[in-house]
Amino acid sequence: MTETGLILMWFPLIILGLFVLKWVLKRVNVWIYVSKLGEKKHYLPPGDLGWPVIGNMWSFLRAFKTSDPESFIQSYITRYGRTGIYKAHMFGYPCVLVTTPETCRRVLTDDDAFHIGWPKSTMKLIGRKSFVGISFEEHKRLRRLTSAPVNGPEALSVYIQFIEETVNTDLEKWSKMGEIEFLSHLRKLTFKVIMYIFLSSESEHVMDSLEREYTNLNYGVRAMGINLPGFAYHRALKARKKLVAAFQSIVTNRRNQRKQNISSNRKDMLDNLIDVKDENGRVLDDEEIIDLLLMYLNAGHESSGHLTMWATILMQEHPMILQKAKEEQERIVKKRAPGQKLTLKETREMVYLSQVIDETLRVITFSLTAFREAKSDVQMDGYIIPKGWKVLTWFRNVHLDPEIYPDPKKFDPSRWEGYTPKAGTFLPFGLGSHLCPGNDLAKLEISIFLHHFLLKYRVERSNPGCPVMFLPHNRPKDNCLARITRTMP
């Protein structure tokens, strides 16, 4: 038989073999996770569990790394219809993706049916004693302790002066530096604020070293948990070790100062964490304090820095919106007594600027998803979410739903005029008992920065068409290279 004849004979068999191999591989996760469910398997949401080990992560990463993040959920809608609930295999676990306001609201607010369910790989980075790793009762207790000093009206009134001074100093400095990475400097600014609130620290050296490690940590939070050199997760674990060591040194020093009755001028959050006792008189140990610090300092600067950048450049790209926001700030200043500083009352008069911030939160959707886990079999929309399965609330799909927000990709702050979103339709800070405890502080920081920026500065991007990266968070690939120019003395 000729060589051509052999090829023609074997070619169909090879193709058939590949199809059989694909069929087998695509059913491995089904055999592992679905077969044992018995009759309940017939009530699972539509979807597929992807490939062995990697599940659906390849299609997820491909969508988010090719600047088309909506294509991931759209592929489910195309194949299975607009059910708003789909089964998948993500971050090493069988899971259910929920993509509508109703399903997201149910998952985030029903604490009897769901509890926090971050992947184990992520828990190793965030800390098992942080808010995402502790019991529901312990979470409520620590949230009560930490929310008021971070987010309460009295605390916000105290922080305004420091935030305003920091913003003015940094903007003036940036305007003399020529081309800068706008995002990188904003993250340092917001990190400076959260360090002051939690640790009373204004040390540039300490802040720079910690902020660099947080950058590495965040790249690993939503990466595949592969602990091998060269992978983002491996670098993130190393960053966590360095952060823990730094915070351990800070906590130890603070405890020693207190033993020696060396007190600072103000009581910060670290003092509160050291002082707190439960009903049995138990205090927090160092691991608990360090994990809480690590979590709060990360959440307290990452979102604020990114969202401030996006609000600034989105307004710069829409001159009419920028002008309207600027005129509002000018009216506020005009009513102010000579020599008076910005007040909390004035920030609450920034109605249009608040709409700009809300629209930025919606369009950008800084938090991709929240992780929950079913405590028992949960019925939802005629389907069953099996006990132990992860549930991912897909915020991006809610915020870009044209039935809720017409022309959803258009940056249009006026859509918020006289509009109160229904529960579950606007989720930038989550919902329910795990609502972000620093949401008001974040909006205050953004408002103060934009107030002074609009009055005295403008930004000119070096690469306006720079591609956007979507993991771990939305950002221009060049970290928004730009020049900050002062427009008035």
Swiss-Prot record:
<keyword id="KW-0408">Iron</keyword>
<dbReference type="InterPro" id="IPR001128">
    <property type="entry name" value="Cyt_P450"/>
</dbReference>
<dbReference type="GO" id="GO:0005783">
    <property type="term" value="C:endoplasmic reticulum"/>
</dbReference>
<keyword id="KW-0472">Membrane</keyword>
<dbReference type="GO" id="GO:0009686">
    <property type="term" value="P:gibberellin biosynthetic process"/>
</dbReference>
<dbReference type="GO" id="GO:0020037">
    <property type="term" value="F:heme binding"/>
</dbReference>
<dbReference type="InterPro" id="IPR036396">
    <property type="entry name" value="Cyt_P450_sf"/>
</dbReference>
<feature type="transmembrane region" description="Helical">
    <location>
        <begin position="5"/>
        <end position="25"/>
    </location>
</feature>
<keyword id="KW-0349">Heme</keyword>
<keyword id="KW-0812">Transmembrane</keyword>
<keyword id="KW-0560">Oxidoreductase</keyword>
<comment type="pathway">
    <text>Plant hormone biosynthesis; gibberellin biosynthesis.</text>
</comment>
<comment type="function">
    <text>Catalyzes three successive oxidations of ent-kaurenoic acid giving gibberellin 12 (GA12), a key step in gibberellins (GAs) biosynthesis. GAs, which are involved many processes, including stem elongation, play a central role in plant development.</text>
</comment>
<comment type="similarity">
    <text>Belongs to the cytochrome P450 family.</text>
</comment>
<keyword id="KW-0479">Metal-binding</keyword>
<keyword id="KW-1133">Transmembrane helix</keyword>
<keyword id="KW-0503">Monooxygenase</keyword>
<dbReference type="GO" id="GO:0051777">
    <property type="term" value="F:ent-kaurenoic acid monooxygenase activity"/>
</dbReference>
<dbReference type="InterPro" id="IPR002397">
    <property type="entry name" value="Cyt_P450_B"/>
</dbReference>
<dbReference type="Pfam" id="PF00067">
    <property type="entry name" value="p450"/>
</dbReference>
<protein>
    <recommendedName>
        <fullName>Ent-kaurenoic acid oxidase 2</fullName>
        <ecNumber>1.14.14.107</ecNumber>
    </recommendedName>
</protein>
<feature type="binding site" description="axial binding residue">
    <location>
        <position position="436"/>
    </location>
    <ligand>
        <name>heme</name>
    </ligand>
</feature>
<dbReference type="GO" id="GO:0005506">
    <property type="term" value="F:iron ion binding"/>
</dbReference>
<keyword id="KW-0256">Endoplasmic reticulum</keyword>
<dbReference type="GO" id="GO:0005789">
    <property type="term" value="C:endoplasmic reticulum membrane"/>
</dbReference>
<dbReference type="InterPro" id="IPR017972">
    <property type="entry name" value="Cyt_P450_CS"/>
</dbReference>
